[in-house]
Swiss-Prot record:
Protein name, per record: Ribosome-recycling factor
Taxonomic source organism: Histophilus somni (strain 2336)
Lineage: Bacteria, Pseudomonadati, Pseudomonadota, Gammaproteobacteria, Pasteurellales
Keyword Cytoplasm: yes
Family: Belongs to the RRF family.
Domain of life where this protein originates: Bacteria
Gene Ontology terms, MF aspect: ribosomal large subunit binding
Cross-referenced PANTHER family: MITOCHONDRIAL RIBOSOME RECYCLING FACTOR PSEUDO 1, RIBOSOME RECYCLING FACTOR
Keywords: Cytoplasm, Protein biosynthesis
Subcellular location: Cytoplasm
Role, per record: Responsible for the release of ribosomes from messenger RNA at the termination of protein biosynthesis. May increase the efficiency of translation by recycling ribosomes from one round of translation to another.
InterPro entries the record matches: Ribosome_recyc_fac, Ribosome_recyc_fac_dom, RRF_sf
Amino acid sequence: MINEIKKDTQQRMEKSLETLRTHIAKIRTGRAQPSLLDGIQVEYYGSPTPLRQLANVVAEDARTLAVTVFDRSLISAVEKAILTSDLGLNPSSAGTTIRVPLPPLTEERRRDLIKIVKGEGEQGKIAIRNVRRDANDQIKALLKDKEISEDEERKAQDEIQKITDTFVKKVDEILADKEKELLDF
């Protein structure tokens, strides 16, 4: 029973970490990364469709993304979607390829982005701590129902805490990498 709780806790914390990675990947660093455009939705036959399903996005160089649209008729819709996104990008089309130059980040903007990254990191840590709290509540319920002893409860809670510490450390590593990426460019 305790092993199931630990396994479930680890899986839920892994999902929290993956969510954090996804959110942080969307934060622009000044370096061209195809994942920057992952959140963009394009109007396609009346319904919003992810850009990834309609085009291929690659980093042409350190400051330019190249978006190759599969269907020529969608070029203007894709261009409009990129332009109206809150990323502050100005695409230009040439044939079936849309080039998206990334403007350099100002020092002030970098500081703002670091604050956003830290906020996302804190949300990730909160999610991980909430998972820990749920696991500890389940363990306390087992003790209350006399399914485990107090020693087993203490041991299980210590193990859950070790798992939590590992995941919080991973969050800190992700944040440090992103901050370094923002400052080094």
